[in-house]
Amino acid sequence: MSTLAEVYTIIEDAEQECRKGDFTNAKAKYQEAIEVLGPQNENLSQNKLSSDVTQAIDLLKQDITAKIQELELLIEKQSSEENNIGMVNNNMLIGSVILNNKSPINGISNARNWDNPAYQDTLSPINDPLLMSILNRLQFNLNNDIQLKTEGGKNSKNSEMKINLRLEQFKKELVLYEQKKFKEYGMKIDEITKENKKLANEIGRLRERWDSLVESAKQRRDKQKN
């Protein structure tokens, strides 16, 4: 049956997309398979098929529909993960800029660059409470240190030393923050990988079930002919 062969090909394409982690394309392929199996297809018109084959096709549709629903959940989860990873990459860029800036801080203007609108696009969006806490604490301490330096000019060296210590502490906190985030995202990626493997196993089960149903239908038809 050429139409079912086409469906098999589409399902195989969907499996490949799943293995690559492209759940959006996999979903589109399964939806295409549903359309091919739709009632508008003359080659699969129920009045031309035996009840066993018709039942097998209905079961196949149900299984494919279930896979589409699972993929929708995975797509939603994947989209959420990508947004979060994008946020972390943005935050890591901020940290890299600060870590790579080894020039001494002299004057209030340098410490208050974060208030400059030109830097807002770089810093936003920062929605992570932990990172916000680290950045706000650093900014608060730097502003205080620089103010003390300005008011007591004789102790400028001590003030600069304090500022450098603040930056060293910030580097350590940022490293711990990034390690924590990478661990969290690693766990989430493992979870998605397990879901992907589960989906691939269910696809294999679906194929075996379909083959069994078709074989059973053939045997019944042969018995009726004999």
From Swiss-Prot:
Localization (cell): Cytoplasm; Preautophagosomal structure membrane
Leader peptide range in chain numbering: none
Keywords: Acetylation, Autophagy, Coiled coil, Cytoplasm, Membrane
KW Ubl conjugation (keyword) present: no
Domain of life of the source: Eukaryota
Record bears the keyword Acetylation: yes
GO molecular function: identical protein binding; structural molecule activity
Membrane-related topology note: Peripheral membrane protein
Residues recorded with modification N-acetylserine: S2
Coiled-coil ranges per UniProt: 52-85, 182-209
GO annotation (BP), single: autophagy
Record GO cellular component, one term: phagophore assembly site
Functional description taken from the UniProt entry: Autophagy-related protein required for cytoplasm to vacuole transport (Cvt) and autophagy as a part of the autophagy-specific VPS34 PI3-kinase complex I. This complex is essential to recruit the ATG8-phosphatidylinositol conjugate and the ATG12-ATG5 conjugate to the pre-autophagosomal structure. ATG38 is required for the integrity of the active PI3-kinase complex I by maintaining an association between VPS15-VPS34 and ATG14-VPS30 subcomplexes.
Family designation: Belongs to the ATG38 family.
Domain notes: The N-terminal region (residues 2-83) bridges the coiled-coil I regions of ATG14 and VPS30 in the base of complex I.
Subunit structure: Homodimer. Component of the autophagy-specific VPS34 PI3-kinase complex I composed of VPS15, VPS30, VPS34, ATG14 and an ATG38 homodimer. Interacts directly with ATG14 and VPS34.
Protein name (Swiss-Prot/TrEMBL): PtdIns3K complex I subunit atg38
The organism of origin for this protein: Saccharomyces cerevisiae (strain ATCC 204508 / S288c)
